Regions:
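C-terminal helical "tail/cap" subdomain of flavin- and related membrane-associated enzymes
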Residues: 302-303, 318-409
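Short beta-strand to alpha-helix junction loop
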Residues: 48, 93-109, 144, 150-151, ...
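Glycine-rich FAD pyrophosphate-binding loop
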Residues: 7-9, 18-42
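Central beta-strand plus flanking loop segment that forms part of the substrate or channel wall
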Residues: 154-189
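Conserved FAD/dinucleotide-binding core of flavoprotein oxidoreductases
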Residues: 192-266
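Conserved mid-domain beta->alpha element of the FAD-binding
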Residues: 6, 17, 269-347
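Beta1/beta-strand and adjacent pyrophosphate-binding region of the FAD-binding site
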Residues: 1-12
Length: 409
C-alpha cells in the first residue's frame, strides 16, 4: 500500500484519488476550496465529456448524473460568414452520448465520495513548503493544479508546444432561453473564418438543464472586446450581441433575450496551449509528478479538457496500481509517455482547429458534407481524436483515405 498525495481537487485529481482509494492506497488530497465554496462559486469549465471518458468514471461508480442530465448524441460543424452564408456544414451521430455536468455540482459530490472512501482532504492553499512536506511524508506527490507558483514548477516542452501565446480570447456562458437545434441534441461547432468560433451544447447546472456556450475570439479581431466587461450582465449582453452579429444562424435559437442560469454562470480567459515536462524537482530534491492540465493544456475549442483529465487519470491510476517499486523519475516519465501516446493526437486535433486549416483537412471536412459515414467518423473524433489517425493529420494519408472512399462509393 502506497501513500500518495495529490494537490488539486478537480476532474483529474479527484478521479485519480477515488480510484487509488478503491485500489487500497492511502491518499491525501489538497484543495484550495471546500465543496461548499466550489458550489457557491463561479463556473470553472464547459466540461463537455464523451463516451470513453464517461466510461472511466462509470468504472469507478462516480457517474452519478448518467441518467438525470441532458445528453447529446450528435456533432455538427458549420462554417459561415456574418451574413449567414454557409460554406461548410456536416452533422454525424455519436456512438455514445456526450454530457456536461457543471463542476459546481460534480466536484463537491466527488469530494464527499473521496472522504467516504477514507481519503484525507486538506483545505489549504498549497505552497512550496507544503509540497515539500507532502513529498517527505508520501511515496508519490502528484500535482493536478496548473496555476500559480506550483504550476510553474513544470518546464515548458518547446518540442511539443508550437504556441507561445493564447490563440483565442475565451468567454464561457451558461444560459436559458437558447433553444436546442432541431433534431438530435448535438454539440454545435460554428466557425466564422478569420473572426472566431461559437461552440454550444446542452448541460446540467445548479437549477437544472441549460445550454452552455463558449465564444472563441481571434485575438485582435472584432470579437476580442472583453477587456472592459465587468459584470455578469455585461458579459451576457456582449455575448448576445456577438452571437447576433457574427453567428446569425445560431442567433435564431434565442427566445427573446438570453438569460443567465445564475449570476456566476460566466467565465473569461485566455489559454496558451502548452505541453510541459511531467517531472519537477523541488528545492529539496524531491520529485513532483504533473497530471492533466498541469502538464498538457489545450484550448477548449474542441472540448477535450475534461476528457483529457479523465484519460490521464486513468493512465496514471492503472500505472500506479500495477507498480510495486519506487515512484522515481524514470517511472514518472514512462507513465506520462504512455498518456502522451494518446494526448499527442488531442494536441494536434485541437491546434489544427485553431489555425487556418491545411488543404487536406478542408478536403476531409467538405467530403463529410455528402458522406454520412465520414461525418460519423468526424463526430466520434470528439470522443477519440486518435481514431482518425493517420488520415486526418497527414496530407498523404488523407489523399489515400479519400481516394479509397471515392473508389468504394
Amino acid at each position: 500500500m502506497a501513500k500518495i498525495a495529490i494537490v488539486g481537487a478537480g476532474q483529474a485529481g479527484l478521479h485519480l484519488g477515488i480510484g487509488l482509494l478503491a485500489g487500497g492506497h492511502q491518499v491525501t488530497m489538497v484543495s484550495n476550496r471546500t465543496g461548499a465554496e466550489i458550489a457557491a462559486g463561479f463556473v470553472t469549465s464547459s466540461q463537455s465529456m464523451y463516451g470513453m471518458a464517461l466510461g472511466f468514471e462509470r468504472e469507478l461508480g462516480i457517474d452519478y448524473w448518467q441518467d438525470g442530465a441532458p445528453q447529446y448524441r450528435a456533432a455538427q460543424m458549420r462554417a459561415a460568414d456574418s451574413e449567414g452564408h454557409v460554406g461548410l456544414f456536416w452533422q454525424g451521430d455519436m456512438e455514445e452520448p456526450g454530457q456536461s455536468i457543471d463542476q459546481r455540482i460534480k466536484m463537491p459530490r466527488w469530494m464527499d465520495r473521496f472522504e467516504e472512501l477514507g481519503g484525507d482532504l486538506i483545505i489549504a492553499d498549497a505552497d512550496m513548503a507544503m509540497l515539500e512536506r507532502l513529498a517527505g511524508s508520501h511515496d508519490l506527490l502528484i500535482v493536478a493544479s496548473g496555476k500559480g507558483e506550483i504550476g510553474r514548477l513544470f518546464e515548458r516542452n518547446p518540442a511539443r508546444s508550437p504556441f507561445t501565446q493564447p490563440q483565442r480570447v475565451l468567454a464561457l456562458t451558461y444560459v436559458h432561453r437558447f433553444r436546442p437545434r432541431p433534431g438530435k441534441p448535438a454539440i454545435c461547432i460554428n466557425i466564422n473564418p478569420g473572426i472566431g468560433e461559437f461552440v454550444s451544447f446542452p448541460g446540467l447546472t445548479l437549477d437544472g438543464p441549460c445550454e452552455i456556450f463558449t465564444i472563441e475570439a481571434i485575438p485582435g479581431g472584432p470579437m476580442d472586446c472583453w477587456d472592459e466587461v465587468r459584470t455578469a450582465q455585461d458579459h451576457l449582453a456582449v455575448s448576445e450581441r456577438l452571437l447576433r452579429d457574427f453567428f446569425p444562424i445560431e442567433a435564431e435559437r434565442i427566445e427573446g433575450h438570453l438569460e443567465l442560469t445564475d449570476d456566476k454562470a460566466v467565465l473569461r480567459g485566455r489559454i496558451t496551449p502548452t505541453t510541459r515536462h511531467p517531472v519537477a524537482t523541488l528545492p529539496s530534491g524531491a520529485l513532483a509528478f504533473g497530471i492533466a492540465d498541469a502538464v498538457c493544456v489545450n484550448d477548449p475549442i474542441t472540448g477535450q479538457g475534461s476528457n483529457n483529465a479523465a484519460k490521464c487519470a486513468k493512465v496514471y491510476l492503472d500505472a500506479i496500481l500495477a507498480h510495486d517499486g519506487p515512484f522515481d523519475a524514470q517511472w514518472m516519465n514512462a507513465t506520462f509517455e504512455t498518456y502522451w501516446d494518446y494526448a499527442r493526437y488531442v494536441v494536434d486535433y485541437t491546434n489544427m482547429t485553431l489555425t487556418p486549416p491545411p488543404p487536406h483537412m478542408m478536403q476531409i471536412l467538405k467530403a463529410a458534407e455528402t458522406d454520412p459515414t465520414l461525418a460519423r467518423l468526424m463526430a466520434n473524433s470528439f470522443n477519440d481524436p486518435k481514431a482518425i489517425a493517420p488520415w486526418y493529420y497527414d496530407p498523404v494519408e488523407a489523399d489515400r483515405f479519400l481516394s479509397e472512399r471515392t473508389q468504394a462509393a
